[in-house]
């Protein structure tokens, strides 16, 4: 092994090898571009890819803040009265949540155009993150729809979510993470689906973005309709899932041995 390392060092320290470095970099660059062109099929393939990237960039903006309701539309949704106006209990297990994520998450729920919601927060944060509890308690004192409980110990994402469920009083249950944010019209659209389609399980598309700018999207996840084979292979539903409390009657809640994939297990 030492002999091989010695020979490698001799090659790297050779003046000719060092002098040819720029030429090798250029050659490798040309090879990589050639491979990329080959993978795209042709020059037309490259053009198509460039066009797709341009479309994707525009779509990211379109599905960002540009999709938020205008003042007029917000007022219209807030005044809407459905035949069924169920309370939606949103479960959020907390653990050492960064302050910026916490404020954005709670703020997005409070900014919903549909107002009959309940935010259930079970906090397993350690003493070094006491600000989580302080902030949540302050908001809960101002808004009775926010229900907060400090846990004696962190029970993991499944255990903490189960504690959230114990706090819930809504007819529908929503699964949410402490680093998520909701589109302002999300609950309105869900309740609309409940009324128009008698839905008891609802999910939506989602996007990953670079906080704090919602428009700086990294990926967009457009989900299919219910596809059992796909769902058996991967949890394409994920968040934001909302389902009728009746669907949980007689079933086991989240199991800690499936932490990380507890939503899929459920």
Each predicted region: which residue ranges?
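A recurrent flexible, glycine/aromatic-enriched loop bordering the glycosyltransferase active site
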Residues: 158, 166, 216-242
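Conserved donor NDP-sugar-binding/catalytic core segment of glycosyltransferases
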Residues: 185-217
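Acidic donor-binding segment of Leloir-type glycosyltransferases
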Residues: 108-153
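Short, well-formed alpha-helical segments that are part of the catalytic scaffolds
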Residues: 97-111
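Acidic donor-binding loop at a coil-to-helix junction in glycosyltransferase catalytic cores
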Residues: 259-266
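Glycine-rich, basic loop-to-helix element that forms the pyrophosphate-binding segment
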Residues: 151-168
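Boundary detector for helix-to-coil junctions that initiate low-complexity/charged tails
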Residues: 1-72, 79-84
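Short aromatic/hydrophobic "clamp" motif used to bind/position activated sugar donors
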Residues: 173
């Amino acid at each position: 092994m030492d002999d091989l390392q010695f020979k490698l060092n001799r090659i790297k320290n050779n003046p000719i090898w060092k002098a040819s470095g720029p030429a090798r970099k250029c050659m490798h660059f040309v090879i990589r571009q050639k491979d990329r062109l080959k993978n795209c099929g042709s020059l037309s393939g490259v053009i198509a890819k460039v066009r797709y990237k341009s479309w994707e960039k525009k779509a990211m903006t379109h599905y960002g803040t540009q999709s938020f309701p205008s003042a007029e539309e917000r007022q219209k949704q807030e005044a809407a009265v459905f035949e069924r106006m169920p309370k939606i209990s949103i479960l959020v297990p907390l653990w050492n949540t960064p302050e910026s994520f916490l404020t954005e998450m709670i703020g997005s729920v409070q900014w919903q155009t549909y107002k009959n919601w309940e935010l259930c927060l079970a906090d397993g944060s350690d003493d070094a993150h006491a600000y989580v509890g302080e902030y949540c308690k302050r908001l809960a004192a101002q808004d009775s729809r926010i229900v907060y409980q400090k846990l004696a110990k962190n029970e993991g994402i499944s255990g903490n979510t189960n504690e959230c469920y114990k706090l819930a009083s809504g007819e529908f249950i929503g699964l949410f993470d402490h680093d998520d944010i909701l589109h302002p019209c999300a609950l309105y659209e869900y309740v609309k689906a409940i009324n128009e389609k008698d839905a008891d399980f609802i999910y939506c598309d989602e996007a990953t973005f670079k906080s704090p700018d919602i428009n700086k999207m990294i990926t967009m996840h457009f989900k299919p309709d219910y596809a059992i084979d796909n769902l058996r292979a991967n949890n394409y539903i994920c968040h934001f899932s909302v389902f009728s409390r009746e669907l949980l009657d007689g079933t086991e809640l989240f199991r800690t041995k499936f932490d990380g994939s507890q939503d899929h297990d459920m």
